[in-house]
Amino acid sequence: MSRIGKMPIHLPKGVEVKISDDNVLTVKGPLGELHQNVNPMIGMKVEDGVLHFSRPNDEKETKAMHGLYRALAANMIKGVSEGFKTVQEVIGVGYKVQATGNVMEMDLGYSHKIFFELAPEIKVETVTEKGKNPIITMTSCDKQILGLAAAKIRSLRKPEPY
């Protein structure tokens, strides 16, 4: 991960990066604002619209953290400027999905309906056409929260392997 950590991150227009004294990285852009605590061992600086990360030594753990925080920052910057999107198809006979605000109502073949509440940062759309499988499209500026929500939805009814 140390090679990833050495690469600078160019900031797109409309994205501001602030580094506080207690090593909290704040990225603000047109789609939202994200915060990330960074290990004090990892140094950060912004020069001429470019974010740089540095490390004090070449120990294995330090190299890993160097690349980790650089990758997290890159995802934050991409999220507040472009956003992230996941598309899931619900495959099964009689399966239904309906979104109302941030609550999804799913009928996944159980004897009861499942109500799944999403984080407020996630925007969801469902498309259900007659004769086709329902499609869930989720968008957010936070990649971690979006991936976690997608994994939880998938775990409600695992795909049939056959």
Predicted segments with their positions:
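Structural preference for solvent-exposed beta-strand-turn elements
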Residues: 1-162
